[in-house]
């Protein structure tokens, strides 16, 4: 049976990603019929929504490192997090080694001392040294598990140059003249960055 209250925190470095994560989590919850609720807490969250969350936290809270710290600094935060069992850090490679990453590390250390059996997930698509990333995220966790995709992607780099350059602009204007060439490459690709 579903019991209301915060069960998981999903930290993302980008507020724009928080909306996508919320929508994806809501689709899964709806498809599975779990009744789980999802909320967002960022600098963009209205005072009305913050008050609603204060009265009744969602099951999954998608937030940023800064907003998480504001919640932790709130009187009575212990009651908010008492039922939390999962902590997900998205785009860990973006946060690691930065001030925002330190905020995540401090929050995790604080929560680990107050929540027994907290499961911590670090998610990243691009990281050079995964062992170091795990150690930074989970310094006090004895059992660490890596899940690494074996999929090898073929990467093709296609430089795009103008057909003719009389004067090379200093900045900003060269890209516009290449838009048609870039659009053609994108239309022929499954995935383009």
Description of each model-found segment:
Residues 1-21, 34, 114-117:
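Conserved SF1/SF2 helicase motif Ia
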Residues 13, 25, 38, 64, ...:
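Conserved structural-core and active-site-/substrate-pathway-adjacent residues in large, well-folded domains
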Residues 14-18, 23, 44-47, 66-69, ...:
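Conserved nucleotide-binding/hydrolysis micro-motifs of P-loop NTPases
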Residues 44-62:
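Conserved motor-coupling elements within RecA-like helicase/translocase cores
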Residues 109, 117-193:
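Conserved interdomain linker/interface between the two RecA-like ATPase lobes of SF2 helicase motors
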């Amino acid at each position: 049976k579903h019991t209301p209250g915060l069960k998981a925190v999903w930290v993302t470095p980008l507020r724009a990603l928080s909306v996508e994560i919320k929508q994806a989590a809501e689709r899964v919850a709806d498809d599975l019929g779990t009744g789980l609720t999802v909320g967002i807490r960022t600098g963009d969250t209205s005072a009305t929504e913050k008050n609603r969350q204060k009265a009744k936290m969602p099951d999954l809270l998608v937030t940023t490192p800064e907003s998480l710290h504001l919640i932790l600094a709130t009187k009575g935060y212990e009651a908010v997090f008492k039922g939390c069992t999962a902590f997900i850090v998205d785009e860990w490679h973006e946060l690691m080694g930065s001030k925002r990453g330190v905020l995540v590390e401090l929050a995790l250390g604080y929560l680990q001392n107050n929540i027994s059996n907290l499961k911590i997930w670090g998610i990243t698509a691009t990281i050079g040294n995964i062992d170091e990333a795990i150690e930074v995220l989970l310094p006090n966790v004895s059992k660490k598990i890596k899940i690494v995709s074996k999929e090898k992607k073929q990467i093709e780099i296609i430089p795009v140059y103008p057909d003719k350059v009389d004067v090379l602009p200093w900045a900003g204007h060269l890209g516009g003249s290449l838009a048609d060439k870039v659009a053609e490459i994108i239309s022929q690709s499954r995935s383009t960055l």
